[in-house]
């Protein structure tokens, strides 16, 4: 995303979340957001790669800040909510529908993740009619999709999805793997936040020397 944005003259601002804060947005990111002047905000929920699910309270607080900043600067701020892992949430975690709380939201969704169809590049955008200049946003998304080409799903897969649209992946299998990996990694001295969603773990090695860690992995013929 960063490269494409910079090519159009955009400035990309990154914010590093901290593992010791459980990658939570409320502690430091929301105050940071309240100070920044932005045109758009990109959010991945559940998060890739930490697996954190941002709850309703966090989304509401974020929406309130964005609405306040829209009034302050007299301009629209677009929240791009990337939600390809929406159905992959564990332990009762609920992924909020951001469009309920913030009008100028575009939602990105991918069946490649929710139905375990990697590489098929098929999904959809939600562009609410309530958002500012929704018709222009829709047209821009349509043109961008045609120009990129690489993300155009073939007609066969579009027909397949039509028949599978209400299907779900085996969440129990993902959850079983999540629990096994988490407990095993912690047992061997690694540290990570147990993911609430998606199928990733953001793991910190017990050895902070990267080169030494790689050499140890090579001894056991591991590909990381």
Regions found by a protein language model. Give the residues of each.
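PLP-dependent class I/II
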Residues: 1-224
